[in-house]
C-alpha cells in the first residue's frame, strides 16, 4: 500500500564489470500535502461508454493497441471515482516542460520545479488534454504516483512504484458542494424575492388603508355638513309651516261654520269614502248622524304627532260630547295612539252587542278604542291627509261606495250560478279597458297618498318657546348668503300679494253687497223678531239648535281652550318675530332683515284677514237664514229621499229607528225654543268669545 509520507524509492541500475561504481543521486524533496478537489456536477461528467471510447481513441493516437490503456506521459493529473480514471495533461506550449515528454513516457526526468511555483496565467495558459481510462477497483492500489492540484496551480506529489513510471493521481471526494451552493443561492434569491413581495404588499396595504381612511374622512365631513343643512331645512320648514297654518286658520274656521249647518255632512262624507266606509257598520252609521264636527290638531310640537276630535250631539249611545284620539311619536319614531274612554249607555256597549251582530268587530268605534290594531295608523293617516283635507269631495258623490259595494254583491249573488261567455275577438278590448281601470285606480291611490294636510293642521294646541324660535332664526340666517334668501322671500311675497289681491277683492265685493242692501238684512231680522211663533221659523230655529247651537253649547269649553291656545301661539309668534329683529340687528346680515320684513308683512296680512273676517259676518248671517228657510221648504223632499235611501240600504227597520230619532229631536227642540231664538245674536259677534285668526 502506498504511503504518502515516504518518498519514492530510487531506481537501481545494473553495473557492468567495466563500469566503476558511482555515488547515488540525492533523494527528491518531500511532496506537498494533499489537496481535496470537488468533483464536477453530474451533468458535466462523461458517461462510462463515452469514457471508454475516448480512452481507446487516445490510445490509438499514441500507437498503442487495444490492450490496456497506458497513462499519458507526465505531467498529468488523474481524477478517479467509481472505477473511472481521467488524465489531465498539459501540452507542449506550457513553459517548463519538454516536447519530448509526450512521446517518451517519462524518459526525461521530471522537472525539479513544481507547477505550484508558476504564476496563475502561465499555469493556465497551455493547452489541456484529457484522457479517460476505465480501471478496476484493484488497480487503484497498484498506482504509483499521486499528484494534487489546487485552484492556483499544480502541486505534484509522487509515489513512485518500482514497476511503473511516475504518475500523478488526484483522489476527489464525492461531495456536491456546488449543488449545495447553488441550492443555497436559489434559496437566498427566493427569500429575497418573498421579502420584497411581502414588503411591497405591506406598503400597498398601508397605502390603501391611508387612502381609504382619507376617503372615509371626506365622506364623514360631507355627511356632517349635509346633516347640518338638513337640520336647518327642517327648522325652516317648520317655521314656514307655522306661517301657512296661521294663514289658513280663518278659512278653516269658516269651513267648520258652514259644515255645522249642513245636516248629515260628515256621515255622508265618511260613508262615501272607499276605505273608511269599510269600518262603519249599521250601528256606527246611526251614531255618526249625531256627529257635528271633525277637527285634526297638532300637538305642542308639529313633529310630535297630532290628535283627532269628534264632536257629537246628545245621543242615546254614549254620554261623551267630544271623543279624542291622539297619535304621538315615541323615541323610535313609531306612532303610539291614545284615546279618551267612551262612556256608553247601559246596553249599548260593543261587547254586549257582539254576540248578536257579526259586524261589531268591523266597527269604527272598536278601532277608535283599540290601540293594538295594525291598521290603526293607516286609517288615521287617511282621515288626516285625505278626508279632513277635502271632505266636500266625498260629500258630493252621488252614491256612497257602500251602496255601490252592496250593488256589486247583489249582482255577484245573482250571477253566481250562471256561466259567462267571453268572445275571443273582443277579449283584447276587455283587457284594455281593465288595464285602464287599474291605471285609474292606481292614480287615485297616489293622489290619496299625497299629504296635503302638512299645511292644513289647525294650531289650537300649537305652542312654541322663545328660545326655540330664536334658535331657528339664528340657524337659518347664519352662514347663508343673501342670494339664497332672495328666492324664497320673493316667492312668499308673490304668494302674499296674490292672496291679498284675490281676497281683498272678494271681501270688498261682499262688503259692498252688504252696504248696498242693508235694508234687506234689517227686514230679515225684523221678520224673525216679529214672528217668533211662526212654525216655519221655529223649525228653522230648531234646526239651528239641533244642528249647531246645541253642539256649540257642548263645545264651549273646547272653544275657550282653543282661543286661549290661539292667544298663546300669537303671543309666542310675536315674541319670535321680535327675536328675529333682534338677531338681525346684532348680526347685520341682509338675510335677517329680509326675514323680519316678511314677518311684518305676514302680521299685516293677518290683521287684514281678521278685519275682512269681521266684515263678512253679516254675509254669514244671511247665508244661515237662507239655509234655514230652504231647509224648512225642503223638509218634505229630504224626508222622502231619506226614506228611499233607508229602504234601499238598510230596510224598514232602519227607517223606523231614524223616524223615532227625529221625533225625539223635535220634542227636545220644542222644549228649548227660547234658547234657539238667541242663535243669530250669538253668531253676530263671534269675535267676543275669543281672539280669531
Swiss-Prot record:
Its main location: nucleus. Keywords: Cell cycle, Chromatin regulator, Cytoplasm, Isopeptide bond, Nucleus, Phosphoprotein, Transcription, Transcription regulation, Ubl conjugation. Residues 23-44 have a biased composition (Pro residues). GO terms for biological process: negative regulation of cell cycle; negative regulation of cell growth; negative regulation of DNA replication; nucleosome assembly; regulation of protein kinase activity; regulation of signal transduction. It is found in: Nucleus; Cytoplasm. Residues 531-542 have a biased composition (Low complexity). This is Testis-specific Y-encoded-like protein 2. It comes from Homo sapiens (Human). The gene is TSPYL2.
Amino acid at each position: 500500500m502506498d504511503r504518502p509520507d515516504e518518498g519514492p524509492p530510487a531506481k537501481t541500475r545494473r553495473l557492468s564489470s567495466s563500469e566503476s561504481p558511482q555515488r547515488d543521486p540525492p533523494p527528491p524533496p518531500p511532496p506537498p500535502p494533499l489537496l481535496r478537489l470537488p468533483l464536477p456536477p453530474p451533468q458535466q461528467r462523461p458517461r462510462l461508454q463515452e469514457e471508454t471510447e475516448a480512452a481507446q481513441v487516445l490510445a490509438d493516437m499514441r500507437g498503442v493497441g487495444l490492450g490496456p490503456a497506458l497513462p499519458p506521459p507526465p505531467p498529468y493529473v488523474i481524477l478517479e471515482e467509481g472505477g473511472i480514471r481521467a488524465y489531465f495533461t498539459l501540452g507542449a506550449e506550457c513553459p517548463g516542460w519538454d516536447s519530448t515528454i509526450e512521446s517518451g513516457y517519462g524518459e526525461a526526468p521530471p522537472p525539479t520545479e513544481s507547477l505550484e511555483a508558476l504564476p496563475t496565467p502561465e499555469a493556465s495558459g497551455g493547452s489541456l488534454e484529457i484522457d479517460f481510462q476505465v480501471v478496476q477497483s484493484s488497480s487503484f492500489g497498484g498506482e504509483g504516483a499521486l499528484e494534487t492540484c489546487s485552484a492556483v496551480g499544480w502541486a505534484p506529489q509522487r509515489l513512485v512504484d518500482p514497476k511503473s513510471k511516475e504518475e500523478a493521481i488526484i483522489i476527489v471526494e464525492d461531495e456536491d458542494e456546488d449543488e449545495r451552493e447553488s441550492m443555497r443561492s436559489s434559496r437566498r434569491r427566493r427569500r429575497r424575492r418573498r421579502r420584497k413581495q411581502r414588503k411591497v404588499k405591506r406598503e400597498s396595504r398601508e397605502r390603501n388603508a391611508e387612502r381609504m381612511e382619507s376617503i372615509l374622512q371626506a365622506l364623514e365631513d360631507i355627511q356632517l355638513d349635509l346633516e347640518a343643512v338638513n337640520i336647518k331645512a327642517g327648522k325652516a320648514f317648520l317655521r314656514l309651516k307655522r306661517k301657512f297654518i296661521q294663514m289658513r286658520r280663518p278659512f278653516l274656521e269658516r269651513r267648520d261654520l258652514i259644515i255645522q249647518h249642513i245636516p248629515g255632512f260628515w256621515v255622508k262624507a265618511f260613508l262615501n269614502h272607499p276605505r273608511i266606509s269599510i269600518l262603519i257598520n249599521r250601528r256606527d252609521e246611526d251614531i255618526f248622524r249625531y256627529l257635528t264636527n271633525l277637527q285634526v290638531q297638532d300637538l305642542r310640537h308639529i313633529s310630535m304627532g297630532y290628535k283627532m276630535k269628534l264632536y257629537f250631539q246628545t245621543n242615546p249611545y254614549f254620554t261623551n260630547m267630544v271623543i279624542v284620539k291622539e297619535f304621538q311619536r315615541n323615541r323610535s319614531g313609531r306612532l303610539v295612539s291614545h284615546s279618551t274612554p267612551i262612556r256608553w249607555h247601559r246596553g249599548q256597549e260593543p261587547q254586549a252587542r257582539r254576540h248578536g251582530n257579526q259586524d261589531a268587530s268591523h266597527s269604527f268605534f272598536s278601532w277608535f278604542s283599540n290601540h293594538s290594531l295594525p291598521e290603526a295608523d293607516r286609517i288615521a293617516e287617511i282621515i288626516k291627509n285625505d278626508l279632513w283635507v277635502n271632505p266636500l269631495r266625498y260629500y258630493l258623490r252621488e252614491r256612497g261606495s257602500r251602496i255601490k259595494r252592496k250593488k256589486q254583491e247583489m249582482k255577484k249573488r245573482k250571477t253566481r250560478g250562471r256561466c259567462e261567455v267571453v268572445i275571443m275577438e273582443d277579449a283584447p278590448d276587455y283587457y284594455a279597458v281593465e288595464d285602464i281601470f287599474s291605471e285609474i285606480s292606481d292614480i287615485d291611490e297616489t293622489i290619496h297618498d299625497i299629504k296635503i294636510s302638512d299645511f292644513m293642521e289647525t294650531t289650537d294646541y300649537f305652542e312654541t318657546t322663545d328660545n326655540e324660535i330664536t334658535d331657528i332664526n339664528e340657524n337659518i340666517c347664519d352662514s347663508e348668503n343673501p342670494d339664497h334668501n332672495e328666492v324664497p322671500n320673493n316667492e312668499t311675497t308673490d304668494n302674499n300679494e296674490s292672496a291679498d289681491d284675490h281676497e281683498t277683492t272678494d271681501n270688498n265685493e261682499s262688503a259692498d253687497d252688504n252696504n248696498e242692501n242693508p235694508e234687506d238684512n234689517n227686514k230679515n231680522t225684523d221678520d224673525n223678531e216679529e214672528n217668533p211663533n211662526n212654525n216655519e221659523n221655529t223649525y228653522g230655529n230648531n234646526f239651528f239648535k239641533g244642528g249647531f247651537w246645541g253642539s256649540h253649547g257642548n263645545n264651549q269649553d273646547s272653544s275657550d281652550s282653543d282661543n286661549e291656545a290661539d292667544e298663546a301661539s300669537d303671543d309666542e309668534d310675536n315674541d319670535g318675530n321680535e327675536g328675529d329683529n333682534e338677531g338681525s340687528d346684532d348680526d347685520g346680515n341682509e338675510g335677517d332683515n329680509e326675514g323680519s320684513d316678511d314677518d311684518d308683512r305676514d302680521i299685516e296680512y293677518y290683521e287684514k284677514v281678521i278685519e275682512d273676517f269681521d266684515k263678512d259676518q253679516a254675509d254669514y248671517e244671511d247665508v244661515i237664514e237662507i239655509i234655514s228657510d230652504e231647509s224648512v221648504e225642503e223638509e218634505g223632499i229630504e224626508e222622502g229621499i231619506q226614506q228611499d235611501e233607508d229602504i234601499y240600504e238598510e230596510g224598514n227597520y232602519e227607517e223606523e229607528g231614524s223616524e223615532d230619532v227625529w221625533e225625539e229631536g223635535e220634542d227636545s227642540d220644542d222644549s228649548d225654543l227660547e234658547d234657539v231664538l238667541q242663535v243669530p245674536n250669538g253668531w253676530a259677534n263671534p269675535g267676543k268669545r275669543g281672539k280669531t285668526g
